[in-house]
Amino acid sequence: MAYFNQHQSMISKRYLTFFSKSKKKKPFSAGQLIGLILGPLLFLLTLLFFHPQDLPWKGVYVLAITLWIATWWITEAIPIAATSLLPIVLLPLGHILTPEQVSSEYGNDIIFLFLGGFILAIAMERWNLHTRVALTIINLIGASTSKILLGFMVATGFLSMFVSNTAAVMIMIPIGLAIIKEAHDLQEANTNQTSIQKFEKSLVLAIGYAGTIGGLGTLIGTPPLIILKGQYMQHFGHEISFAKWMIVGIPTVIVLLGITWLYLRYVAFRHDLKYLPGGQTLIKQKLDELGKMKYEEKVVQTIFVLASLLWITREFLLKKWEVTSSVADGTIAIFISILLFVIPAKNTEKHRRIIDWEVAKELPWGVLILFGGGLALAKGISESGLAKWLGEQLKSLNGVSPILIVIVITIFVLFLTEVTSNTATATMILPILATLSVAVGVHPLLLMAPAAMAANCAYMLPVGTPPNAIIFGSGKISIKQMASVGFWVNLISAIIIILVVYYVMPIVLGIDINQPLPLK
């Protein structure tokens, strides 16, 4: 266990070092400084010189705001969350929305769904339930190198459906490295060193990639999906329920994990090592060190199961009582969170309850503010007439094959999110695709869903996602290796996403992909 803790500390330091190296000591990097100036400049130039006859002044004003915010999001001229506060200032100044209307978007039900999800995830982490779940899954799947690789992917993917992708990978990487270290120490004379090294690289990448893939399983698994839910409601007044998305998302995760496992094991890092020296023994040892499940773990496990059941059965049960509109997914998330604050802890002097308000320090408030900013901007785009105008301009695409548009959108977003924030990418592109769907005469989810899913999937560069940065920080994989392997995983993801959106999602959600919805 000491080695595990030591390695976890080492990963954390390398993870932080990776990002600290990428930041300049100056207040702004060259790119940030350019973005800082370019954003307001585009705002002014748009107001002064862009005046189409069929676009009202309010539409021009919101377009100018959008260009400013998008520039600062992409270049990260100031923190992304700080940029997301601009609508509170700029939309009322242009008489687009009242201060009350803008501010209310930052308290949208969708934001509270994610807030509740974060609190539940932190409860799992505080009482170490996620580690027990992960080790149990790995132990059950088997002892061969192929099964250990699959076990780590299944465990990481499952965790990242409910806790952040970053937290899932941060937990699993030290365990993986400890197993590799044990294998090196117990290596037999006839064991091929190259095979162990190949397994080592495949395991590190498998953990990182599974953390990213698993986020697609639930609406709270990754920010782009919660943005999809919010933007879809904002533009069209329809809801994507937690349960229905799971029916779409979990099969997608299973297929992606399976194909990625096959690719890493038998193509990218093919080796002849069938069994890893000491691998299964170490997993059992770590499970034994956890001991019996504590009272607090049982409470969190029960709450987790309760939350899942309520999310899954909400629509079915509440329709019978005719109160569907009174209880949303966010309502359930906050109810579950309150239970965690109420139930006392027993086996510790440090924490009196399962969760206390100290947890607020760990919540990613910046992500929640970004969601609110995106929803406020979407409201401004709709209210100003900009959405209608954009739809008219995009009518030239009417007649282009919908499948071709889906392919282009998916691949474009997949590679764009390698160098930009996945959350900012989804926030910027989904309102445009909402309007585009009306222009080309297709259901909005045919365009918006693949973009949101693709925004989550970045496998090539350390800066693409926090999981990528963590596995790069392990020192076991080079950027060149990550890019070459990640390129093919990107393409695999694109193919699966397109097939799921075109053939599975319409059946599950009960939509006609050729039937557009009117904008609100």
Curated annotation (Swiss-Prot):
GO CC entries: plasma membrane
CDD domains: SLC13_permease
Membrane-spanning intervals of the chain: 30-50, 55-75, 77-97, 104-124, 160-180, 207-227, 242-262, 298-318, 323-343, 362-382, 399-419, 428-448, 452-472, 491-511
GO-annotated biological processes: carboxylic acid transmembrane transport; sodium ion transport
NAD is among the record's keywords: no
Topology within the bilayer: Multi-pass membrane protein
A Pfam family it matches: Na_sulph_symp
GO molecular function: organic anion transmembrane transporter activity; symporter activity
Compartments it resides in: Cell membrane
InterPro entries the UniProt entry points to: SLC13A/DASS
Keywords: Cell membrane, Ion transport, Membrane, Sodium, Sodium transport, Symport, Transmembrane, Transmembrane helix, Transport
UniProt cross-references to PANTHER family, sorted A to Z: SOLUTE CARRIER FAMILY 13 MEMBER, SOLUTE CARRIER FAMILY 13 MEMBER 2
Function: Mediates the transport of the dicarboxylates fumarate, malate, and succinate across the cytoplasmic membrane via a Na(+)-electrochemical gradient.
UniProt record similarity statement: Belongs to the SLC13A/DASS transporter (TC 2.A.47) family. NADC subfamily.
Record protein name field: Sodium-dependent dicarboxylate transporter SdcS
Organism: Staphylococcus aureus (strain MSSA476)
